[in-house]
Swiss-Prot record:
It comes from the Bacteria. It catalyses: succinate + ATP + CoA = succinyl-CoA + ADP + phosphate; GTP + succinate + CoA = succinyl-CoA + GDP + phosphate. Coiled coil: none annotated. This is Succinate--CoA ligase [ADP-forming] subunit beta. The lineage of its organism: Bacteria, Bacillati, Actinomycetota, Actinomycetes, Acidothermales. Pathway: Carbohydrate metabolism; tricarboxylic acid cycle; succinate from succinyl-CoA (ligase route): step 1/1. ATP binds at K45, G52, R53, G54, V94, E99. Mg(2+) binds at N191, D205. It comes from Acidothermus cellulolyticus (strain ATCC 43068 / DSM 8971 / 11B). Succinyl-CoA synthetase functions in the citric acid cycle (TCA), coupling the hydrolysis of succinyl-CoA to the synthesis of either ATP or GTP and thus represents the only step of substrate-level phosphorylation in the TCA. The beta subunit provides nucleotide specificity of the enzyme and binds the substrate succinate, while the binding sites for coenzyme A and phosphate are found in the alpha subunit. Belongs to the succinate/malate CoA ligase beta subunit family. Substrate binds at N256, G318, I319, T320. Its EC number is 6.2.1.5. Its cofactor is Mg(2+).
Length: 392
């Protein structure tokens, strides 16, 4: 889960990392009220989960409340890299002497953690890496030892914090590491971490990615959920306990096990080349041991996508029994018909493995509209691509 800037700063403050005072506004009047309370110059910043806000006009300085309201009016509703702005952060402006970059992240190549930093903050780190890679400091972190005062001091020195703020930099680095560990994050980034004219260090912007697999340890994470920022189908699937990712094609794909589903995506895309570039519309893994209820929920999610022109259900029965999958398909159709929904999307079903014969018999007996059974994966992919192309 990626956090908005204001949410990231909330976590920073909880772990002792200094931030500027600020509040979130959803309309210009709220922005003006916040600016009055803060007093002085403020910055009005679009809250979207992407970079490039400044270049897109999503960050504006305001000298007073009226200017803050005008800035909020200009920013709210704009689209930045495909993300609509629904709220802004109004925060105190500061005079900057220097900008730094600091981050902790998962280093997948080493199967451990990594500290990164640079004295060239304030721009996207990818740009620094491309133009001046030697300006980026990388310090591996032993997962069993973490970041103590000695290592934090080494990182601060490598980045190049001056003596006047070195101790504060060490304290902030340890606070960010604490946030990284305590919150089960895969990324904690401050860009920029600024040194002010009076030698204070402040996190002016922040990015945090939380590991969704650790949600069970953090029941309070629900407060970070933002329905306006989530794909409604992905949110619906997550609520049903399904692993669903929306893609940009026309063929809905349902399978059991991530490996099989990914292979199915490849086979569908390959077959789709013959039919004008037909592609998968989603990844949906119903998991091992899926019940009829889970299958029904998955099919309901996929059929709710208006981009889907055909659906491929590809199941190799192991722990997941094929007859349970078949009952789920029947249940999904019954529920949709009972709700008055028209089922005009064809389904291609390939069942193999545990209780496949029983599953195929259940589907044959149900005589569901527009459901075809196919024996092999390749034939199923070709047929679903053909049907999707015909329905374009």
């Amino acid at each position: 889960m990626d956090l908005f800037e204001y949410q990231a700063k909330e976590l920073f403050a909880a772990h002792g990392v200094p931030i500027t005072p600020g509040e979130v506004a959803e309309n210009p009047d709220q922005a003006a009220d916040i600016a009055r309370r803060l007093g002085g110059r403020v910055v009005v910043k679009a809250q979207v989960k992407t970079g490039g806000r400044g270049k897109a006009g999503g960050v504006k300085l305001a000298d007073d409340a009226d200017a803050a309201a005008a800035a909020a009016e200009a920013i709210l509703g704009m689209e930045i890299r495909g993300h609509r702005v629904h709220r802004v952060l109004v925060t105190t402006a500061v005079d900057i002497a220097h900008e730094y970059y600091v981050a902790f992240l998962v280093d997948r190549s080493r199967r451990s953690f990594l500290a990164m930093g640079s004295a060239e903050g304030g721009v996207e780190i990818e740009q620094v890496a491309a133009e001046n890679p030697q300006a980026i400091v990388r310090v591996p972190i032993d997962a069993t030892e973490g970041v103590d005062a000695t290592l934090a001091a080494r990182i601060a020195d490598d980045i190049g914090f001056p003596a006047a703020v070195r101790d504060e930099a060490v304290r902030i680095l340890r606070g960010l590491w604490e946030a990284f560990q305590a919150e089960d994050a895969s990324l904690v980034e401050v860009n920029p971490l600024v040194r002010t004219l009076d030698d204070r260090l402040i996190a002016l912007d922040g990015k945090v990615t939380l590991d969704d697999n650790a949600d069970f340890r953090h029941p309070d994470r629900a407060r970070f959920a933002d329905p306006s920022a989530a794909d409604p189908l992905e949110a619906k699937a997550k609520a049903a306990g399904l692993h669903y990712v929306k893609l940009d094609g026309e063929v809905g794909v349902i399978g059991n096990g991530a490996g099989l589903v990914m292979s199915t995506l490849d086979v569908v895309a390959y077959a789709g080349e013959t039919y004008g570039g037909i592609r998968p519309a989603n990844f949906l893994d119903i998991g091992g041991g899926a019940s009829a209820e889970v299958m029904a929920a998955g099919l309901t999610v996929v059929l709710a996508d208006p981009a889907v022109r055909a659906v491929l259900v590809n199941v190799f029965g192991g722990i997941t029994a094929c007859d349970a999958v078949a009952r789920g398909i029947v249940a999904a159709f019954e529920n949709l018909i009972a709700a008055g929904e028209r089922i005009d999307v064809p389904l291609v079903v390939r069942l193999d493995g545990n209780r496949a014969a029983e599953g195929r018999a259940i589907l044959a007996a149900a005589q569901l509209p527009r459901v075809e059974q196919v024996e092999t994966m390749d034939d199923a992919a070709r047929r679903v691509a053909e049907l999707a192309a015909a329905a374009r």
